Protein backbone atom coordinates (compact mmCIF):
# COMPACT_ATOMS: atom_id res chain seq x y z
CA UNK A 1 0.00 0.00 0.00
CA UNK A 2 2.80 2.36 0.96
CA UNK A 3 4.74 1.55 -2.20
CA UNK A 4 1.66 2.29 -4.31
CA UNK A 5 1.20 5.71 -2.62
CA UNK A 6 4.87 6.54 -3.22
CA UNK A 7 4.52 5.73 -6.92
CA UNK A 8 1.46 7.97 -7.24
CA UNK A 9 3.25 10.81 -5.44
CA UNK A 10 6.25 10.48 -7.73
CA UNK A 11 4.06 10.67 -10.84
CA UNK A 12 2.17 13.74 -9.63
CA UNK A 13 5.24 15.63 -8.46
CA UNK A 14 6.33 18.50 -10.69
CA UNK A 15 10.01 18.82 -11.62
CA UNK A 16 11.83 21.55 -9.74
CA UNK A 17 13.06 24.55 -11.66
CA UNK A 18 16.50 26.03 -11.17
CA UNK A 19 16.24 29.79 -11.21
CA UNK A 20 18.47 31.23 -13.90
CA UNK A 21 18.90 34.97 -13.41
CA UNK A 22 17.84 37.11 -16.33
CA UNK A 23 20.11 39.73 -17.87
CA UNK A 24 23.81 39.97 -18.48
CA UNK A 25 24.90 37.91 -15.49
CA UNK A 26 23.36 34.73 -16.86
CA UNK A 27 24.58 34.99 -20.43
CA UNK A 28 27.66 37.18 -20.10
CA UNK A 29 31.09 36.00 -21.03
CA UNK A 30 34.42 37.72 -21.12
CA UNK A 31 36.09 40.07 -18.69
CA UNK A 32 34.24 42.73 -16.70
CA UNK A 33 37.46 44.68 -16.78
CA UNK A 34 37.00 45.21 -20.51
CA UNK A 35 33.37 46.25 -20.36
CA UNK A 36 31.82 42.80 -20.71
CA UNK A 37 30.42 40.60 -17.97
CA UNK A 38 31.22 37.13 -16.76
CA UNK A 39 29.05 34.56 -15.00
CA UNK A 40 29.70 34.63 -11.25
CA UNK A 41 31.45 31.65 -9.67
CA UNK A 42 29.11 29.00 -8.32
CA UNK A 43 29.14 29.22 -4.55
CA UNK A 44 30.38 26.07 -2.90
CA UNK A 45 32.13 24.74 -5.99
CA UNK A 46 35.31 22.88 -5.12
CA UNK A 47 38.41 24.23 -6.81
CA UNK A 48 40.72 21.51 -8.17
CA UNK A 49 43.89 21.13 -6.14
CA UNK A 50 45.96 21.89 -9.24
CA UNK A 51 44.65 25.47 -9.19
CA UNK A 52 46.59 27.51 -6.67
CA UNK A 53 46.23 31.05 -5.35
CA UNK A 54 48.11 33.74 -7.21
CA UNK A 55 49.54 37.09 -6.28
CA UNK A 56 47.65 40.06 -7.67
CA UNK A 57 48.84 43.64 -7.66
CA UNK A 58 46.36 46.46 -8.00
CA UNK A 59 46.08 50.13 -7.18
CA UNK A 60 43.00 51.12 -5.20
CA UNK A 61 42.25 54.79 -4.58
CA UNK A 62 45.84 55.69 -5.37
CA UNK A 63 47.42 53.14 -3.04
CA UNK A 64 49.22 50.01 -4.30
CA UNK A 65 48.27 46.59 -2.94
CA UNK A 66 49.75 43.14 -3.39
CA UNK A 67 47.84 40.14 -2.09
CA UNK A 68 47.22 36.46 -2.66
CA UNK A 69 43.80 35.66 -4.10
CA UNK A 70 41.94 32.40 -4.51
CA UNK A 71 40.83 31.54 -8.05
CA UNK A 72 37.13 31.82 -7.16
CA UNK A 73 37.33 35.21 -5.41
CA UNK A 74 35.63 38.14 -7.07
CA UNK A 75 37.00 41.64 -7.06
CA UNK A 76 34.20 42.58 -4.67
CA UNK A 77 35.36 39.88 -2.25
CA UNK A 78 38.85 41.36 -2.25
CA UNK A 79 37.83 45.01 -2.01
CA UNK A 80 35.22 44.54 0.69
CA UNK A 81 36.47 41.62 2.78
CA UNK A 82 40.24 41.80 2.35
CA UNK A 83 40.91 45.52 1.89
CA UNK A 84 38.02 46.97 3.87
CA UNK A 85 36.36 49.10 1.18
CA UNK A 86 32.81 48.62 2.43
CA UNK A 87 31.24 51.01 -0.08
CA UNK A 88 31.28 48.04 -2.44
CA UNK A 89 27.88 46.51 -1.70
CA UNK A 90 25.98 43.30 -2.48
CA UNK A 91 22.32 43.91 -3.29
CA UNK A 92 21.66 41.19 -5.89
CA UNK A 93 23.74 38.29 -4.49
CA UNK A 94 26.40 38.56 -7.16
CA UNK A 95 24.18 38.42 -10.25
CA UNK A 96 25.44 41.73 -11.66
CA UNK A 97 21.91 43.10 -11.67
CA UNK A 98 21.94 46.09 -9.30
CA UNK A 99 25.09 48.20 -9.67
CA UNK A 100 25.67 48.46 -5.92
CA UNK A 101 29.13 46.91 -6.27
CA UNK A 102 30.25 49.29 -9.04
CA UNK A 103 33.80 50.61 -9.08
CA UNK A 104 35.90 52.48 -11.61
CA UNK A 105 38.48 50.15 -13.11
CA UNK A 106 41.02 51.48 -15.57
CA UNK A 107 38.80 54.50 -16.16
CA UNK A 108 35.61 52.59 -16.86
CA UNK A 109 32.70 51.55 -14.61
CA UNK A 110 32.81 47.87 -13.71
CA UNK A 111 30.73 45.50 -11.60
CA UNK A 112 33.16 44.14 -9.05
CA UNK A 113 30.93 41.12 -8.34
CA UNK A 114 31.38 40.03 -11.95
CA UNK A 115 35.15 40.45 -12.13
CA UNK A 116 37.40 37.59 -11.05
CA UNK A 117 40.07 39.04 -8.78
CA UNK A 118 42.84 37.00 -10.38
CA UNK A 119 42.06 38.73 -13.70
CA UNK A 120 42.53 42.18 -12.18
CA UNK A 121 46.30 42.09 -11.86
CA UNK A 122 47.65 45.55 -12.66
CA UNK A 123 44.24 47.21 -12.52
CA UNK A 124 43.79 50.78 -11.32
CA UNK A 125 40.61 50.93 -9.26
CA UNK A 126 38.66 53.72 -7.62
CA UNK A 127 35.84 53.15 -5.14
CA UNK A 128 33.35 55.57 -3.61
CA UNK A 129 35.76 56.03 -0.69
CA UNK A 130 38.35 57.46 -3.06
CA UNK A 131 35.79 59.77 -4.65
CA UNK A 132 34.73 61.03 -1.22
CA UNK A 133 38.32 61.52 -0.04
CA UNK A 134 38.99 63.63 -3.13
CA UNK A 135 35.97 65.81 -2.19
CA UNK A 136 34.39 65.39 -5.59
CA UNK A 137 31.41 67.75 -6.14
CA UNK A 138 29.15 64.71 -6.46
CA UNK A 139 29.46 64.05 -2.74
CA UNK A 140 28.25 67.50 -1.70
CA UNK A 141 25.53 67.43 -4.36
CA UNK A 142 24.23 64.12 -3.10
CA UNK A 143 24.10 65.47 0.44
CA UNK A 144 22.42 68.76 -0.44
CA UNK A 145 19.77 67.08 -2.59
CA UNK A 146 18.85 64.52 0.08
CA UNK A 147 19.52 61.82 -2.45
CA UNK A 148 20.10 58.99 0.00
CA UNK A 149 17.34 57.40 2.03
CA UNK A 150 18.74 54.04 3.08
CA UNK A 151 21.99 54.93 1.30
CA UNK A 152 22.76 51.37 0.27
CA UNK A 153 22.85 52.09 -3.45
CA UNK A 154 24.51 55.49 -3.19
CA UNK A 155 28.17 54.43 -3.67
CA UNK A 156 27.36 52.63 -6.92
CA UNK A 157 25.43 55.63 -8.24
CA UNK A 158 28.27 58.01 -7.32
CA UNK A 159 30.87 55.83 -9.02
CA UNK A 160 28.80 55.56 -12.20
CA UNK A 161 28.01 59.28 -12.21
CA UNK A 162 31.68 60.22 -11.88
CA UNK A 163 32.57 58.32 -15.03
CA UNK A 164 29.63 59.92 -16.84
CA UNK A 165 30.74 63.45 -15.92
CA UNK A 166 34.33 62.72 -16.92
CA UNK A 167 33.15 61.89 -20.43
CA UNK A 168 30.16 64.21 -20.65
CA UNK A 169 30.42 67.44 -18.60
CA UNK A 170 26.90 68.58 -19.51
CA UNK A 171 24.67 65.51 -19.74
CA UNK A 172 20.97 65.76 -20.50
CA UNK A 173 18.38 64.10 -18.29
CA UNK A 174 18.02 61.27 -20.81
CA UNK A 175 21.79 60.78 -20.91
CA UNK A 176 21.92 60.61 -17.12
CA UNK A 177 19.09 58.07 -17.08
CA UNK A 178 20.85 55.96 -19.68
CA UNK A 179 24.10 56.07 -17.72
CA UNK A 180 22.34 55.01 -14.51
CA UNK A 181 20.26 52.29 -16.16
CA UNK A 182 22.28 49.54 -14.48
CA UNK A 183 21.92 50.98 -10.97
CA UNK A 184 18.92 50.09 -8.82
CA UNK A 185 17.63 52.34 -6.02
CA UNK A 186 15.37 50.31 -3.76
CA UNK A 187 14.03 53.50 -2.15
CA UNK A 188 12.97 54.91 -5.52
CA UNK A 189 14.94 58.16 -5.25
CA UNK A 190 15.77 58.34 -8.95
CA UNK A 191 14.72 62.01 -9.45
CA UNK A 192 17.03 63.04 -6.62
CA UNK A 193 19.94 61.17 -8.19
CA UNK A 194 19.40 63.08 -11.43
CA UNK A 195 19.24 66.44 -9.64
CA UNK A 196 22.43 65.71 -7.71
CA UNK A 197 24.32 64.78 -10.87
CA UNK A 198 23.11 67.89 -12.68
CA UNK A 199 24.24 70.05 -9.78
CA UNK A 200 27.66 68.40 -9.64
CA UNK A 201 28.00 68.92 -13.39
CA UNK A 202 27.34 72.65 -12.97
CA UNK A 203 30.00 72.87 -10.27
CA UNK A 204 32.53 71.07 -12.44
CA UNK A 205 31.76 73.45 -15.30
CA UNK A 206 32.28 76.43 -12.99
CA UNK A 207 28.65 77.53 -13.20
CA UNK A 208 27.77 77.11 -9.52
List each model region and its residues.
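Signature of N-terminal electron-transfer/Fe-S-associated modules in redox systems
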Residues: 2-208
